[in-house]
A protein has these predicted regions:
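Carbohydrate transferase catalytic cores enriched for Leloir-type hexosyltransferases
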Residues: 1-379
Length: 379
């Protein structure tokens, strides 16, 4: 079967969908040597190798088109020009778009990955321009696609409930956790990362794009309440690049009695994440909605206990290996943090359970699920 995958998100996005695409397609390249794959890249070429540095196998080829991704997006999704993807990517039997939208197709069967429906479930947390675009593009994409992929059963249920996608048309392909996410034992590496990001000696870690959906304002409020209840030595570190309405997060930190206890190191490079997780006393992930939620599992893989929101796909991802709380309850979040930091037995149980839980999610399993979805698409 000739399969074309839009690899552009892997080149344009360092985290999130970019990381998902790199991990999944890298594992697929290691798994499948029978089908013929084209990696469609708009405007730029990938490196010479796959995600693990090895060469792409002979059944994978890269097709770079001179159009920038932004211009293609305008042509396909805003102007709705009838420009079939095959005209740019070459003849193919199946075209997979891993980033919510699906271009016009002449004969190929379409597969689209919808990572979440946050633009419908928590619309107040989405950039209005992006929300308006997704509200137009995603319903059409899932309608035209032969198969729709979701990162979790929670997102699959949302697709069925909110967009009417038949359950039999959806395949769930969870993300994997890379083997490099493990407890870092090298003191020099830990010291280097601590110095690079000016991290305090002890801290609670929050990680994600600084935007309303990640719920960092309530995390800051919970931390302030925690310090009023029972002052603890841990600072609060919120790492991530600025997103939509990020200024409100900084403003909330300044409003607190001891803003110097709240640190914003900015975007953290991928290679530094295992050390960052390892250095933290606890990882807090109070997001209002997630299609899957990779960071809590990465933290678990690094031996860090996790407190996590109990909404959307997060209970499905973390199971009983995290302390689950209501993301909208500041007092409950503060109480959960206090328990997590103060109860040694609870911490030990969550560390052990977390390591086991994270080990259940591998990119090789995800690639096997993707290949099964491709086979179903071609039936």
């Amino acid at each position: 079967v000739r399969i074309t995958i839009d690899y552009t998100p892997a080149l344009r996005q360092s985290a999130g969908i970019g990381r998902y695409t790199r991990g999944l397609i890298g594992a697929l390249a290691a798994l499948d040597r029978q089908n013929q794959y084209t990696l469609f890249c708009a405007g730029q070429a990938p490196g010479a190798g796959s995600t693990d540095g090895a060469s792409w196998p002979p059944n994978f080829r890269v097709r770079v088109v001179p159009w920038q991704a932004r211009h293609l997006g305008i042509a396909w999704h805003r102007l709705q020009l009838p420009l079939p993807a095959e005209w740019l990517a070459g003849p193919t039997d199946l075209f997979h778009s891993p980033d919510f939208t699906l271009p016009p197709l002449a004969r190929a069967r379409g597969v689209v990955t919808v990572h979440d429906l946050s633009f419908l479930t928590v619309p107040e947390c989405a950039d209005p321009r992006l929300r308006a675009f997704l509200e137009r593009a995603v319903p059409g994409a899932v309608r035209r696609a032969r198969r729709v992929l979701a990162d979790s059963a929670s997102t699959a249920n949302d697709l069925n409930r909110l967009l009417g996608v038949p359950a039999e048309k959806i395949s769930v392909v969870p993300a994997g956790i890379e083997p490099r996410f493990e407890p870092v034992r090298d003191p020099a590496c830990l010291a280097r990362v601590r110095a690079r990001y000016r991290l305090p000696e002890r801290f609670i870690l929050g990680l994600g794009t600084l935007e309303p959906r990640k719920n960092f304002v309530r995390l800051i409020q919970a931390y302030a309440e925690l310090q009023r209840r029972a002052p603890l030595p841990q600072n609060l570190v919120i790492a991530g690049g600025p997103g939509w309405l990020y200024e409100g997060i900084y403003a909330e930190a300044r409003r607190q009695a001891a803003p110097e206890r709240i640190c914003f190191p900015g975007f953290v490079a991928d290679e530094d994440l295992p050390a960052l997780y390892t250095l933290a006393d606890a990882f807090a992930f109070p997001s209002l909605y997630e299609g899957f939620g990779i960071p809590p599992l990465e933290a678990m893989a690094c031996g860090t206990p996790v407190i996590c929101a109990n909404n959307s796909s997060l209970p499905e991802a973390v199971g009983d290996a995290a302390l689950l709380v209501d993301a909208t309850d500041v007092g409950g979040l503060a109480g959960g943090l206090l328990g997590l930091l103060g109860d040694g037995a609870l911490r030990a149980r969550l560390v052990t359970a977390g390591l086991a839980r994270a080990g259940r999610f591998t990119w090789s399993d995800a690639a096997a699920g993707l290949l099964a979805a491709y086979r179903q698409t071609m039936l």
